[in-house]
Design a protein with these regions (language model features):
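Active-site mouth loops of central-metabolism enzymes
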Residues: 73-87, 161-163
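Secretory targeting and sorting signals
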Residues: 1-30
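Short coil/turn segments at secondary-structure boundaries
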Residues: 79, 115-122, 160-164
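Aromatic-lined carbohydrate-binding/catalytic grooves of carbohydrate-active enzymes
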Residues: 98-125
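Active-site region of glycoside hydrolase catalytic domains
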Residues: 33-68, 72, 125-334, 343-442
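Catalytic domains of carbohydrate-active enzymes, especially glycoside hydrolases
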Residues: 81-108, 263, 312
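Generic anion/oxyanion-binding catalytic loop in active/binding sites
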Residues: 77, 84, 116, 158, ...
């Protein structure tokens, strides 16, 4: 399993999940549609939006990612991203205007601890104000402790190759928990650990298996600490779901941390695309997509992702911590599928999952605004689009999905008469073998 994990990480499964080969699965014709209810998600459903620290804040201190960008001259320069650091009151107000209950942000370790022996009170004061503004706008903060970014001095020590990294990490994270537990946040310890490992393998020659063990230890220890400090806390580490290979990719992680998750946090974006379906290279191999916007969007796949974890953790709450759809620089997609289409279709499948007995409790849209997608500003995920490359004013322009999400939140779902714009794909293109063993249909 360790050797397999290393190979998977090196292959980049977490961000190019649809290109990962799995055992051959026939693309069986789905059975005739049968009636299926998709009732309201309920008044207690936790609608939210999501962002991360480094991707949005700008004015970045020295960190591993600042250096990775410097080491890759072909990447977009970071500059000040979309400047959430200066514009957070307006962005938080935009989120509140959607009617959502949760605003997810990251707390950047690099901003809080510039050297091993010093803490920056100005960094803490910034997050004090952000979190208080979220609360003042009637939303609950969801705080991510580690969204792949750590101080430059920690990289100098070897990053996650350093045997002392877990203790350095815990020293900071305990301070963060002590400071903000009284605000009653929801906690995400480590964002998408397998994708995190993938980036560290590529950029810092990190040993994948070692980092998996270290990240799991960090999660488990801070989970216990949060529960000591904050009564009734909700703590998770969200997985980046990999259609067609979830057990192989995230299984080793869940074996290590599954006993210390108060809810299962799932990030779902893309379906499975067998390489043989897109042959275009002279040697007969599949072409690598130019960008995320070319990866297969299968909204019904979120049903199988939730089903997967509902079966593995019966009765455990399920929260979609991230979900969205990329476009290329905000341009209309070649297939004509809009952000509103994708959002409504996805919510339809959330309602189907809930109606079928899955304990779905929350959904965060990724993301409130466009941001820096770990090397590029070209992939756009935002409800509000921002042209970080050419607009010096960084204007937030609402997409068609803003009004759609506002209506969805107000109604706690799509209408009972709603029919998805994008009907289910052939089962072998969604999440095999599950999507072929028991395919869902639209009545």
């Amino acid at each position: 399993m360790r050797t397999r994990l290393h190979r998977l990480v090196l292959a980049g499964v977490a961000t190019a999940s649809t290109l990962l080969p799995v055992a051959a699965v026939g693309s069986a014709t789905p059975p005739a549609p049968t009636a299926a209810a998709h009732g309201s998600l309920g008044e207690n459903f936790m609608w939210g939006v999501a962002a991360s620290g480094f991707q949005s804040e700008g004015h970045a201190p020295d960190s591993n990612w600042e250096r990775y960008i410097q080491n890759n001259p072909d990447w977009d320069r970071y500059r000040n991203s979309i400047d959430f650091r200066s514009r957070y009151p307006n962005d938080i107000a935009l989120a509140a205007g959607l009617g959502v209950k949760v605003f997810r942000i990251g707390i950047e370790w690099a901003r809080l601890q510039p050297t091993p022996d010093t803490w920056d009170e100005n960094g803490f004061a910034f997050y004090d104000s952000v979190i208080d503004t979220i609360l003042e706008n009637g939303m609950q903060p969801m705080l991510t402790l580690d969204h792949w970014v750590y101080p430059g001095w920690a990289l100098d020590r070897g990053g996650w190759n350093n045997p002392g990294m877990v203790q350095d990490w815990l020293t900071n994270m305990r301070k963060v928990v002590d400071r903000y537990a009284s605000r009653n946040p929801v906690w995400v310890t480590v964002n998408e650990p397998v994708a995190y490992i993938m980036h560290e393998v590529r950029q810092n020659d990190t040993v994948a298996d070692h980092m998996l063990d270290e990240v799991a230890q960090a999660h488990n220890e801070i989970y216990d600490y949060i529960h000591q400090v904050q009564r009734g806390a909700l703590v998770t580490s969200n997985v980046g779901y990999v259609a067609g290979a979830e057990n192989k990719v995230n299984g080793p992680l869940m074996e290590r941390i599954g006993g210390k998750l108060d809810f299962i946090g799932v990030d779902y974006y893309f379906g499975y695309e067998p390489p043989s379906n897109s042959v275009s290279q002279p040697d007969g191999s599949a072409a690598t997509p130019k960008g995320m916007w070319e990866l297969p969007v299968r909204p019904e796949g979120i049903y199988y992702a939730l089903q997967h974890y509902s079966e593995k953790f019966p009765g455990k709450p399920l929260w979609v911590v991230e979900n969205g759809m990329p476009t290329e620089d905000g341009k209309p997609r070649a297939d004509g599928y809009t952000r509103s289409d994708h959002l409504r279709d996805t919510v339809y499948w959330l309602q189907r999952a809930k109606a079928d007995g899955m304990n779905v409790v929350g959904y965060n849209y990724w993301s409130l605004t466009d941001n820096y997608e770990w090397s590029s500003y070209t992939p756009r995920f935002g409800l509000f689009t921002v042209d970080a490359k050419s607009d010096p004013n960084l204007k937030r322009t609402p997409t068609d999905a803003v009004d759609s999400y506002r209506r969805i939140v107000a109604a706690n779902g799509v209408p009972s008469t709603y029919v998805p714009v994008r009907l289910p794909s052939e089962c072998g293109l969604v999440d095999p073998p599950a999507s072929c063993d028991d395919p869902v249909t639209v009545p």
